[in-house]
């Protein structure tokens, strides 16, 4: 007798598995985890080095023969611009530079050491710090000609230091002098804020700022410290052809020993109901006054 044919199913096949598509508005596993962090797979700087980012800062670094560059990164839309910038450099410089590596924009977003999204404009350079000059060499090269210096008394914010460097570049400052301690090292934040000035204004580091002031005074350089209780107006700075302006940290201002070593204490007149000026703004005003007498 032939077996009956029918539609009976095994009990395990009663409800076959179905493939379901996500419903509208449902959360996938990626949604639950949240958006991926920008620069999660960001490039790493070389040992003892750092990143410089932004069009002006990177191009200034490329043009500086003293700047050692490990790697160059660009996005697809800026790679050709960066290559053309390199091609325009003297051959003695361009042959020392690495080829441009095209990289996804999101990877470059996360190169900052503080985790903030980098405003890199599609250009990043991995570099090593410049060799800092000695104060004695700076003074020797200046000779007896008129010149300007800035001294920073324990300014630790790289953004402030970078902004001061930018003003120093604009007003022809020969060098900026700071201390080894309580001062920022060369880094990307400083370079980005300086907008290329890091490659033009030497950053001199000294162990003791008071002794550095004594060296300047021995070289016939007038040292003027900016202070809210200064007795001279900032316009008076223009009378000194060889001048070093000392800036203190926001809040504490100049340390006592630094104040005692200054030849003059100078103030910037502000409205009586105003608290104070940002130190980088104060530096720009002082440099302008030293140049124009205004």
Feature annotation, model-predicted:
Residues 94-95, 136, 142-232:
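RNA substrate-binding interface of SAM-dependent RNA methyltransferases
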Residues 224-279:
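Active-site/ligand-binding-proximal alpha/beta "capping" segment
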Residues 167-170, 189-197, 256-294:
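Structured adenosyl-cofactor binding patch, chiefly the S-adenosyl-L-methionine
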Residues 111-128, 194-198, 202, 240-248:
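Short basic, glycine-rich beta-strand/loop surfaces that mediate nucleic-acid
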Residues 51, 99-102, 203, 223-225, ...:
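Conserved beta-strand scaffold positions in the cores of enzyme catalytic domains, especially
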């Amino acid at each position: 007798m032939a077996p009956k044919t029918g539609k009976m199913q095994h009990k395990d096949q009663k409800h076959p598995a179905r493939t379901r598509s996500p419903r509208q508005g449902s959360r996938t596993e990626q949604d639950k985890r949240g958006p991926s962090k920008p620069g999660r797979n960001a490039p790493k700087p070389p040992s003892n080095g750092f990143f410089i980012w932004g069009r002006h800062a990177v191009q200034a670094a490329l043009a500086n023969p003293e700047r050692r560059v490990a790697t160059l990164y660009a996005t697809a839309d800026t790679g050709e611009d960066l290559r053309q910038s390199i091609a325009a450099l003297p051959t003695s410089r361009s042959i020392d530079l690495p080829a441009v590596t095209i990289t996804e924009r999101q990877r470059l977003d996360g190169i900052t050491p503080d985790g903030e999204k980098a405003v890199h404009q599609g250009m990043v350079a991995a570099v090593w710090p410049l060799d800092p000059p000695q104060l004695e060499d700076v003074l020797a090269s200046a000779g007896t000609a008129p010149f300007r210096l800035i001294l920073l008394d324990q300014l630790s914010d790289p953004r402030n230091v970078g902004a001061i460097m930018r003003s120093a570049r604009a007003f022809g400052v020969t060098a900026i002098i700071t201390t080894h301690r309580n001062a920022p090292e060369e880094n990307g934040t400083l370079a980005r804020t300086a907008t290329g000035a890091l490659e033009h204004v030497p950053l001199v580091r000294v162990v003791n700022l008071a002794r550095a002031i004594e060296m300047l005074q021995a070289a016939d350089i007038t040292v003027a410290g900016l202070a809210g209780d200064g007795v001279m107006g900032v316009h008076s700075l223009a009378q000194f052809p060889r001048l070093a302006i000392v800036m203190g940290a926001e809040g504490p201002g100049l340390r006592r020993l630094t104040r005692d070593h200054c030849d003059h204490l100078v103030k910037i007149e502000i409205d009586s109901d105003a608290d104070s000026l940002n130190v980088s703004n104060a530096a720009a005003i002082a440099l302008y006054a030293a140049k124009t007498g205004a």
